[in-house]
């Protein structure tokens, strides 16, 4: 029985194609059962994230099964026949290696990201619960999880923040340590505010306030990140009690200056204040960094730190590939589970 991976991802298909084939999480079980019922498919696992949709299946007639799976997707109102060109197929050891690279974050849009490991685990557990796996799929995925974990523990592929939002969070943790109880003020309700706000909330920040000229947008963002919307004309009243400020408005001038902060120092008891300026033009005057307890990072500095982390991760790829090759030889001493 041969293991096959049939799918598309961020490298082979743009988002407007990927979204047509995406399988919502609440439909993964049903989709797995439908694919398992196709001719030639003996076992299967369906993985669907924002950046990929993949079918891992086992078959004694893999080419025949692949035709039926493609027909299922393309003939299900999701695409035309020429969309088959967006799909890739890996068989045998190549399919196993691909699964291990996916689990390790080597095949992710953000190299080394960790979320995919949990997403694959969820996909496998759903398939297991749906009764569409058997010995080959179960043993292969369990061993692949071990390999994926080994790559992460024996390499630095996941080290360092690679997005502006995650860099900002890491810097905040360097200043405050545990972010539990940290109070945050977000100025602006765009994409950068959302990403950074979510990252801070995920690390334990509490009392997140969102101010935007459009109060409706502030309410919307606050709802996404567990925060509270406040009117834009009163955000200055909150600075005395805030630990972190994320500035990302469209204002054409600085809205936080030395004159804004100096009168507040005593009432703040000279507590540390972390300012994240991710707006262009800048929202925070650079000279506020001269205030002893103020830490200011702008978009250029954050981007530079993220780029350095990306370069560092790329240098780890060959090491990770070697770990995967060696681990496949160790954990799969024969090819019975994926290529027989």
From Swiss-Prot:
Keyword Mitochondrion: no
Site entry: Important for activity: 98
Keywords: NADP, Oxidoreductase, Porphyrin biosynthesis
EC number: 1.2.1.70
Catalyzed reaction equations: (S)-4-amino-5-oxopentanoate + tRNA(Glu) + NADP(+) = L-glutamyl-tRNA(Glu) + NADPH + H(+)
Residues bound to NADP(+): 188-193
Family under the similarity heading: Belongs to the glutamyl-tRNA reductase family.
Subunit structure: Homodimer.
Entry function: Catalyzes the NADPH-dependent reduction of glutamyl-tRNA(Glu) to glutamate 1-semialdehyde (GSA).
Protein name: Glutamyl-tRNA reductase
Species, as recorded: Akkermansia muciniphila (strain ATCC BAA-835 / DSM 22959 / JCM 33894 / BCRC 81048 / CCUG 64013 / CIP 107961 / Muc)
Gene: hemA
């Amino acid at each position: 029985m041969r293991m096959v991976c049939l799918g598309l991802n961020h490298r082979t298909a743009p988002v407007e194609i990927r979204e047509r084939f995406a399988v919502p999480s609440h439909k993964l079980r049903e989709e797995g059962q439908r694919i398992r019922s196709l001719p030639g498919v003996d076992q299967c696992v369906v993985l669907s994230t924002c950046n990929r949709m993949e079918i891992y299946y086992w078959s004694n007639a893999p080419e025949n099964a692949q035709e039926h799976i493609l027909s299922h997707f393309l003939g299900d109102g999701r695409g035309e026949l020429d969309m088959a060109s967006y799909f890739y197929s890996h068989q045998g050891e190549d399919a196993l290696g691909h699964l291990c690279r996916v689990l390790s974050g080597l095949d992710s849009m953000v190299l080394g990201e960790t979320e995919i490991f949990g997403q694959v685990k969820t996909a496998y557990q759903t398939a297991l619960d749906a009764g569409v796996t058997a010995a080959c799929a179960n043993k292969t995925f369990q061993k692949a999880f071990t390999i994926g974990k080994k790559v992460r523990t024996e390499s630095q592929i996941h080290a360092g923040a690679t997005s502006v939002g995650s860099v900002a969070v890491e810097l905040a943790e360097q200043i405050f340590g545990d972010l539990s109880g940290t109070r945050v003020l977000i100025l602006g309700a765009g994409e950068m505010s959302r990403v950074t706000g979510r990252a801070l909330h995920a690390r334990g920040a509490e009392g997140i306030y969102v101010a935007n000229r459009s109060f409706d947008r502030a309410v919307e963002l606050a709802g996404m990140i567990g925060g509270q919307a406040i009117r834009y004309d009163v955000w200055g009243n909150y600075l005395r009690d805030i630990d972190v400020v994320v500035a990302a408005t469209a204002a054409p001038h600085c809205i936080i200056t030395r004159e804004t902060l100096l009168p507040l120092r005593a009432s703040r008891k000279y507590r540390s204040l972390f300012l994240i300026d991710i707006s262009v033009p800048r929202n925070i005057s650079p000279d506020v960094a001269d205030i002893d307890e103020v830490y200011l990072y702008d978009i250029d500095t954050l981007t530079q730190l993220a780029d350095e982390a990306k370069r560092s991760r790329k240098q780890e790829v060959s090491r990770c590939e070697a770990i995967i090759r060696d681990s496949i030889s160790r954990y799969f001493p024969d090819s019975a589970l994926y290529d027989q």
